[in-house]
Design a protein with these regions (language model features):
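Glycan-recognition and catalytic cores of secretory/periplasmic carbohydrate-active enzymes
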Residues: 1-182
Length: 182
């Protein structure tokens, strides 16, 4: 695969791209760029092609009863797109697009509110269920996750120029804004 270093958690985009990404943007220090490229490769080890998404919590597969993908992972896609355009493996962009597409299909209810966690069969990739881990209830909108989706799908649209993502993020944003307190 892309990296010999396995990822033990999905939070690599949060931890690395926010800091090293801005560090590289401001200083052009090549050491920062290399950290980002290496981290993107490591994050890619969580991608399961049979599912089409990155696994979020490898240590919790048994707890959730399958391949678990959380909405937070949408934030990581920006680092994958960046790495693919800046000397990394172009396949990283394919991973980001696959993850966004599968998340768009199964992580949202018909009213465009999101689950915190989507659980997939580890062998077939079939969607099993949507649940919450940090939100109020499995059938409630998780506000923080909804915000992750707004940011993540805006990035996916910016990087792909595919209007499907723009249309989708507008609907996700509308339901989020509609549910804010007055």
């Amino acid at each position: 695969f892309l990296s010999r270093t396995p990822a033990f958690d999905h939070d690599l985009g949060f931890l690395i791209f926010c800091s090293y990404g801005n560090g590289y943007r401001l200083t052009q220090n090549p050491a920062y760029k290399q950290v980002i490229l290496d981290t993107a490769d490591t994050l890619a080890t969580l991608f399961k092609p049979q599912v089409g998404t990155m696994l979020s919590w490898p240590r919790n597969v048994e707890l959730f009863g399958g391949h678990n993908t959380i909405m937070d992972n949408m934030i990581n896609l920006e680092m994958l797109f960046w790495a693919a355009k800046n000397g990394g493996n172009p396949y990283l962009a394919d991973i980001a697009i696959s993850h966004a597409d599968k998340t768009m299909k199964y992580h949202f209810r018909p009213d465009y509110t999101s689950y915190h966690v989507a659980v997939y069969d580890t062998l077939t990739g079939d969607f099993i269920k949507g649940v919450t881990h940090q939100g109020y209830a499995d059938n409630s909108m998780w506000a923080r996750g909804q915000a992750w989706a707004v940011y993540g799908y805006t990035v996916v649209y910016r990087e792909t120029k595919d209007c499907r993502y723009l249309d989708f993020v507008q609907k996700v944003t509308d339901v989020y804004l509609k549910n804010l307190p007055e």
